[in-house]
């Protein structure tokens, strides 16, 4: 993937090839500027690749598609709309009758602990609550693939840990979440090695720009994940392996 900058062509990604299985949780880690966010935008159909191709469910991605939901680092909630109306926005943008999705919107908000906040404005919510609303919005049309671009990066450490557990619960690791084959496929970008190891089935480690795959590391940790998993020897070994890959200097 090459794009034009003021200083000339910039190669953001090179020779990226990997697949993600249905219902799998895959994390992407790498140094700043290695193309992680660019890769997500290509998968989402927001940016066309300059070489190669991307497919979702076997179909090439050439434009934004309904099968993909996206959550950004900032919640990007419209400040003049209520929480409920923000969650319903994807239905409106897709030309669908929003009132048909009100029931699902209420269910999602209840699932993430925002029941009773439907009529609130974004400014009345904490950062973590805003990000919960953003997650509900991405899930409204029930996309099988969820792309998450550092969604918890701006949160404090304790709220971030809470959101990690909340995400796993919604994904299907706890009561009330999806089960088995109903789980979403998630591609999750983060700068946090512990977050990647805690959440993912596999961690894709990327090299500096142009971003390439340095290694794909299976997490190998049992599910459901618990807070105690962070203290396990296997967790520490994998986190250290990824850290060594990211800090390795070329010979």
Question: For the regions a protein language model found, what residue spans apply to each?
Answer:
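ABC family nucleotide-binding domain
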Residues: 1-194, 199
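Active-site/binding-pocket entry motifs
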Residues: 2, 222-223, 248
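Short hydrophobic beta-strand elements within the C-terminal catalytic ATPase subdomain
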Residues: 56, 205-206
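Short, glycine/charged-rich "phosphate-handling" switch motifs in NTP-dependent
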Residues: 202
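Conserved beta-strand-loop-alpha-helix hinge in the C-terminal portion
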Residues: 206-238
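Extended, non-globular alpha-helical segments
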Residues: 239-251
